[in-house]
From Swiss-Prot:
GO terms for molecular function: tRNA (guanine(37)-N1)-methyltransferase activity. GO terms for cellular component: cytosol. This is tRNA (guanine-N(1)-)-methyltransferase. SUPFAM superfamilies: alpha/beta knot. It comes from Bifidobacterium longum subsp. infantis (strain ATCC 15697 / DSM 20088 / JCM 1222 / NCTC 11817 / S12). Disulfide bonds: none annotated.
Amino acid sequence: MKIDIVSVFPEYFEVMNLSLMGKAQAKGLLEIKAHNLRDWTHDVHHSVDDTPVGGGAGMVMKPEVWSECLDELLGFSRPSDSSAPSGTPVLIFPNPSAPLFTQRDATELSHADHLLFGCGRYEGYDARIPDYYRSQGVDVREYSIGDYVLNGGEVAVSVMLEAITRLMPGFMGNPDSIVEESYTGEGALLEHRQYTKPAVWRGIAVPDVLLSGDHGKVDRFRRDEALARTAEIRPDLIAALDCKALDKADRKTLMALGWEVSAAHPRRLAD
């Protein structure tokens, strides 16, 4: 996968050379390049922002600088090109006002050949930038990573990149390690809690069933704990489950947790 990142702080992404991300680049699974948006400016101050039209606080990133940069990285030969060239990357902008980035989005994007991320700063980027490239046939995505605001898009891009790339075949040393993770697959739940040795630490024991050697009981315990944790922390995920896909033990557990499971989707009895 090829990944291009545009930022006024490209050095921020040197962290991508560490850990599994760095190993994936060394193996040729990833090619990551960070570009400095100021390289496409033409004034002595290398300005990338201007005051907001209509007034207001802060500064807004200028569309003409972004367009020169994106035209080049997207392979547009001239501004009048009427459609995106073949093989155009998916163009992604972090935006706190956009839809939430989810594991499903990460899974979809992990199959892409080329991703291009644009990092906003200040009050953000001119809204015409994503609108224009959508009109040219580019697959433009805008995502939020949560209900909070950051100083810029670099942190959000790093979060999305890690979520996406770790799902690529060959990225993880043990591919089974992502199978039972939180939010993974259809009927996604939060993951069960994890333990390691020693069996007793500071008076707190690992649950006995995990030491039993009975894989069936261990699997059931973990599944029940995942259901219980999800019901407590993210009941919306329980409510989205397909009751037809639940086995008898799942139904029993959810009923004990106060959920009704006879309809298409579980419903809390207190609702």
